[in-house]
């Protein structure tokens, strides 16, 4: 809902694109800060407590940008919204790890698929309310009320929390993040940077590099996001059969191939195929990384997920920002080979998702299937 109202709020506050771009960095900074703080609280009080609390915070903060009167108040509103969004993100993913543990099979990608579907639904509803002439305060306020009510009503259905008070089995407080988690976080940065590039530059690629009309160019993001949603609906079955390593390895490889096809294509139809292949390939990568991080240590689910999600989110923010300056030294389509290389690296190092054989603190309630694809 917030994304749909960006142009209207930007005009109402009276800031230009340049200033608004800087203000959006506060949204990202708040999200990363919220993710890191949420990880500690989740390990102390459990995801069952943090999910509804963070959902209420995020929902209530949704109306704040619509109430902003200048750049300063908009920046403060975006910072608070970012904290709420980041806190909710880690809380939901941590609880999804608990759900996987109960089912004893992969379900993380399904959660991410419903997130994508929710974004589509919110965009449609937001567009409709704008068409009715609703002000941002009214439509975002209604969305905030809906979010708070949904958080309260669904809270009893959440699984009992695994509060660990941030300690290991031996009672010692955990102060260091394992190297394996940081490696997963680095892979999340690479994959989510590639997603960010597709989200923000695929439409501009068709318009500026292939001279497509604005209406036709919009299909680039549509092809990418649709393929990603469908891929996430199927990724859990693939992970259950072939294992998470195969999902990340061959998914990242397909993502690299799709991005390369889009970058090198001289025609709009083949470029759309490339963006769709990229979306399908990348669809299951991030869920597998989040799941593996959460299952690494039952005493630090929140902390580990927050590290991977936080660094991944930085990649999502950095990717689009890096492409812009690169266009001053090379054509736009050639800049896409940066995410191509990163996806190739992710594919080559996917073995990090394998369960360490000598790791007494590693708990994987979702048994990894034999990796028939390597």
Predicted regions and their residues:
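Conserved MFS/SLC helix-loop-helix module at the cytosolic interface between two early adjacent transmembrane helices
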Residues: 33-72
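Short hydrophobic/small-residue motifs within alpha-helical transmembrane segments
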Residues: 28-29, 116-121, 225-230, 313-315
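Symmetry-related core transmembrane helices of the 12-TM Major Facilitator Superfamily/SLC fold
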Residues: 137-156, 336-352
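Helix-to-loop junctions at the C-terminal end of transmembrane segments
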Residues: 34-46, 130, 231-244, 327-328
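Helix-breaking motifs and short loop linkers at transmembrane-helix boundaries and internal kinks
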Residues: 14, 46, 67-72, 211, ...
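Intracellular juxtamembrane helix-capping segments at the cytosolic ends
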Residues: 87-101, 284-297
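Short amphipathic helix-loop junctions that connect adjacent transmembrane helices
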Residues: 3-18, 200-216
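Paired small-residue
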Residues: 61, 72-81, 258, 269-277
């Amino acid at each position: 809902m917030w994304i749909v109202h960006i142009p209207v709020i930007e005009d109402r506050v009276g800031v230009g694109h340049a200033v608004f771009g800087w203000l959006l960095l506060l949204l990202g900074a708040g999200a990363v800060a919220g993710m890191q703080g949420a990880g500690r609280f989740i390990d102390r009080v459990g995801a069952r407590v943090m999910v509804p609390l963070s959902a209420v915070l995020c929902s209530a903060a949704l109306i704040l940008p619509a109430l902003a009167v200048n750049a300063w108040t908009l920046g403060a509103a975006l910072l608070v919204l970012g904290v709420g969004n980041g806190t909710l993100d880690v809380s939901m993913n941590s609880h999804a790890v608990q759900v996987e543990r109960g089912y004893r099979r992969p379900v993380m990608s399904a959660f991410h698929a419903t997130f994508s579907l929710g974004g589509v639904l919110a965009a449609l509803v937001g567009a409709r309310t704008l068409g009715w002439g609703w002000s941002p305060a009214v439509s975002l306020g209604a969305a905030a009320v809906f979010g708070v009510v949904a958080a309260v009503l669904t809270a009893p259905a959440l699984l009992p929390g695994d509060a660990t008070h941030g300690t290991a089995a031996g009672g010692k407080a955990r102060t260091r993040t394992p190297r394996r988690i940081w490696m997963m976080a680095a892979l999340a940065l690479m994959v989510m940077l590639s997603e960010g590039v597709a989200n923000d530059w695929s439409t501009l690629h068709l318009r500026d590099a292939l001279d497509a009309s604005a209406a036709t160019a919009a299909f680039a993001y549509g092809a990418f996001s649709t393929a990603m949603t469908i891929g996430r609906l199927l990724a859990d079955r693939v992970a259950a059969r072939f294992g998470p390593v195969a999902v990340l390895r061959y998914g990242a490889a397909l993502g690299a191939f799709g991005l390369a096809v889009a970058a090198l294509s001289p025609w709009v139809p083949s470029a759309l195929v490339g963006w769709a292949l990229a979306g399908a390939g990348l669809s299951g990568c991030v869920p597998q990384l989040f799941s593996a991080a959460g299952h690494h240590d039952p005493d630090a689910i929140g902390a580990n997920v927050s590290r991977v999600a936080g660094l991944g989110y930085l990649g999502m923010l950095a990717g689009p920002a890096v492409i812009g300056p690169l266009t001053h030294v090379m054509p736009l389509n050639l800049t896409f080979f940066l995410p191509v290389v990163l996806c190739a690296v992710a594919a080559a190092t996917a073995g990090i998702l394998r369960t360490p054989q000598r790791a007494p603190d590693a708990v994987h309630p979702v048994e990894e299937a034999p990796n028939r694809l390597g």
